[in-house]
């Protein structure tokens, strides 16, 4: 029997970005959705197991510690694996700035999946647990749950941005190291005949 938890949040007047609902599913083998569309963004976080996502005839194999995004009005099909069905949590959200934020995070067909580190995934799981546990709809909780959504997206964005920057940062550090070494050689041999080839050989 599939185990599912669902938390719905009341509609608010916030138009920029707002949390609509969140949930958690321990899926049965081959449990599926679609082909169908959603009227909002739906971000899934795969906690264990695996499955597949099909969008525009492109198939993605999704495993633990990955997330996948369903965009509004996008025809999708996704299905749990037969042998190792996935367990995932999800958040549904919309708002006039939601497309902008998703684009800045690097999402958009065909880039609909991201792999996160175990550490970041654990932090996100804690935030999802909080969202699922909140039951009372009031102004205080409206602020709290929307704040958690923004924090969750921020953690995803920070990890993605850091991952992109690592090769660039490493290259920049190596370049700076070579520059400093070249300066040191020039200073050490100041007043002597130096050639570019000599400096290059010393680096």
Give the positions of each predicted feature.
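Generic protein-terminus/edge-of-domain signal
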Residues: 1-67, 74, 82, 105-117
């Amino acid at each position: 029997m599939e185990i599912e938890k669902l938390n719905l949040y009341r509609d608010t007047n916030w138009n920029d970005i707002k949390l609509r609902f969140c949930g958690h599913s321990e899926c049965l083998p081959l449990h599926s959705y679609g082909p169908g569309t959603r009227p909002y963004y739906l971000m899934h976080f795969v906690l264990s197991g695996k499955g597949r996502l099909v969008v525009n005839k492109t198939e993605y194999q999704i495993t633990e510690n990955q997330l996948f995004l369903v965009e509004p009005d996008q025809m999708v099909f996704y299905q749990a694996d037969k042998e190792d069905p996935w367990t995932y949590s999800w958040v549904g959200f919309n708002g006039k700035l939601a497309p902008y934020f998703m684009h800045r995070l690097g999402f958009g067909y065909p880039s609909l999946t991201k792999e996160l580190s175990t550490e970041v995934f654990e932090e996100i799981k804690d935030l999802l647990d909080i969202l699922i546990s909140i039951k009372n709809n009031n102004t205080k909780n409206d602020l709290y749950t929307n704040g958690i959504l923004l924090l969750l997206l921020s953690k995803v964005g920070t990890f993605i941005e850091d991952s992109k920057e690592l090769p660039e940062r490493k290259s920049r550090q190596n370049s700076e190291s070579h520059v400093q070494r070249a300066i040191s050689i020039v200073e050490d041999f100041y007043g002597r005949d130096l050639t570019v080839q000599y400096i290059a050989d010393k680096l």
